[in-house]
Amino acid sequence: MSVTVEILENLERKVVLSLPWSEINAETDKKLKQTQRRAKIDGFRPGKAPLKMIAQMYGASAQNDVINELVQRRFYDVAVAQELKVAGYPRFEGVEEQDDKESFKVAAIFEVFPEVVIGDLSAQEVEKVTASVGDAEVDQTVEILRKQRTRFNHVDREARNGDRVIIDFEGKIDGEPFAGGTSKNYAFVLGAGQMLPEFEAGVVGMKAGESKDVTVNFPEEYHGKDVAGKTAVFTITLNNVSEPTLPEVDADFAKALGIADGDVAKMREEVKKNVSREVERRVNEQTKESVMNALIKAVELKVPVALVNEEAARLANEMKQNFVNQGMTDAANLDLPLDMFKEQAERRVSLGLILAKLVDENKLEPTEGQIKAVVANFAESYEDPQEVIDWYYADTSRLQAPTSLAVESNVVDFVLGKAKVNKKALSFDEVMGAQA
């Protein structure tokens, strides 16, 4: 099969496919005879309409189908013969100069995967993040858990920061009510930042039954465009004040956290174990991000546009599905521009190609034991870990995510062994405040 692969721009290639008319006509005749056997045409018994009539009715579409099928088949035959690593799907175009009457020519335009060459990793710098969990961090976490279980009890006094208040309010701009500016029995916690600072400051010091007018200046960057940069006067009536009460760290508190016998020491150990696992996950994520950045720097790579577009479309669909899951049912019909995902998509495709090369060259495929360890780590935070483990192994397709994580872990360890490693110790607050 003699064809010439023409190099276009970047990773784009072009081949001209030649389809003999004799083959096209023979395949078209076969398809028309198949159609004849199935055809139900008025005036004829099923399958008995003349072939000439079938050809008149369906000949053009049958020939078009045959050409499409032959083009696809011929292209992939060429790709195999020429050892072309095709990325994405080819685009087929007609050739204007059909100078050979014996054949029909079609141009296939496609991209190929780039040659990935890993640079000198010893020249790259990466950060290995560390953090520790001790008694102070356990105390801090227990305090957070206490606050999450805060109870509010009614009090007959003026409102203070930290209190939960229930109010009626009516806002006006230039003497006119505005959308979203009125509510009855609206509850919020003073000092939690749920309302604008001027609004909250106006409520502090009020007692139940009192009313007052409070002037509020909406910031220019306020999310409500109709009121952004404007001044409103709110008439506020305070209906109820409740002060927060935190639970004691005792047996009842421990039982509420799942410690059956209410042993506080056991509870603290469980808290430490869970927090340590989360801290480890987050520092590993930050270290992995540093490693991935180093790999991007170490490899000069042009990525196939087709793969970037596919990944961008996948990210757009993922975002829409997340919106739907949050209750925004109309989000499924959102027309999200793919350009907003292009940078992220290009990075993901690049890393996918780099990691595949690195794993293949350095035999970094995970062992069965490594995959099991990832699954066990997933399962550890559940009430019945064995049930979770069994779920993963009931369907091997569910092991894709644990396998990918095991691969990434091997890659991170490999790069850390080659690159210049700068250790970076973070505080508990820095780790838990990081997005991971």
UniProtKB/Swiss-Prot annotation:
SUPFAM superfamilies noted in UniProt: FKBP-like (SSF54534), Triger factor/SurA peptide-binding domain-like (SSF109998), Trigger factor ribosome-binding domain (SSF102735)
Cellular component GO terms, alphabetical: cytoplasm
UniProt superkingdom: Bacteria
Domain PPIase FKBP-type, first and last residues per copy: 162-247
Disulphide bridges, residue numbers: none
Reactions this protein catalyses: [protein]-peptidylproline (omega=180) = [protein]-peptidylproline (omega=0)
Gene Ontology biological-process entries: 'de novo' cotranslational protein folding; cell division; chaperone-mediated protein folding; protein transport; protein unfolding
MF annotations from Gene Ontology: peptidyl-prolyl cis-trans isomerase activity; protein folding chaperone; ribosome binding
Claim: Chaperone is one of the keywords in the record: yes
Annotated compartments: Cytoplasm
Entry's EC annotation: 5.2.1.8
UniProtKB keywords: Cell cycle, Cell division, Chaperone, Cytoplasm, Isomerase, Rotamase
InterPro entries: PPIase_dom_sf (IPR046357), PPIase_FKBP_dom (IPR001179), Trig_fac (IPR005215), Trigger_fac_C (IPR008880), Trigger_fac_C_sf (IPR037041), Trigger_fac_ribosome-bd_bac (IPR008881), Trigger_fac_ribosome-bd_sf (IPR036611), Trigger_fact/SurA_dom_sf (IPR027304)
Family (UniProt): Belongs to the FKBP-type PPIase family. Tig subfamily.
Notes concerning its domains: Consists of 3 domains; the N-terminus binds the ribosome, the middle domain has PPIase activity, while the C-terminus has intrinsic chaperone activity on its own.
Name this polypeptide is given: Trigger factor
Native organism: Neisseria gonorrhoeae (strain ATCC 700825 / FA 1090)
Gene: tig
